[in-house]
Amino acid sequence: MQNLKKYLVNGLKNTLLFKNNAGISHNGPWKQIYADTQLDRWHVGEFSSVEYTISADFDTNNKEIIKVLITATRDRASVVVYARNNTLNDIIEVTATVNDSYVDVILNPVIDGDLTPTTDFTGAKVIYTAQYFHTQTPLVV
């Protein structure tokens, strides 16, 4: 295992500082996207919001990265895609469902019959990162 002290030191305001402009890279394991693929699940009693970065890869010409915010209560989930960049087309759609216990983050491939030829991104591969924000006010039944 790498010695993390080579790359990290204490930063200002209780942060971690990466030495020598070091960065973070992400690679798998990936999920393949079909209809209603569950990307993530979290309990609303533990977390209230999550920020996702999702990278989708369909083939050599179709790549996409999106930034998504999801905030939820026991009976409502709000999804905001606030940044999206791709090489040709949107590849995935993001939704969330919630019940009294947990939030499911759901991905669907874009299937667009209006394009010529018909565009179907079923089977695209995605990887993601998530930053979870804890619930500050406990749920009351």
Language-model-detected regions and their locations in the chain:
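Terminal beta-strand-rich extracellular "head" domains
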Residues: 71-93
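Surface-exposed ligand/attachment interfaces on beta-rich extracellular proteins
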Residues: 21-49, 57-63, 141
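Hydrophobic residues embedded in beta-strands of well-ordered beta-sheets
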Residues: 16, 77-78, 101-103
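Short, low-complexity N-terminal tether/leader segments at secretion or assembly junctions of large
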Residues: 1-22
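Low-complexity intrinsically disordered segments
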Residues: 85-141
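Short, hydrophobic/aromatic-rich segments at coil-to-beta transitions
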Residues: 46-53, 78-80
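Broad, structure-driven detector of short, well-ordered beta-strand segments within folded domains
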Residues: 7, 64-72, 92-96
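Short, flexible beta-strand-to-coil junctions
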Residues: 53-64, 69-73, 109-112
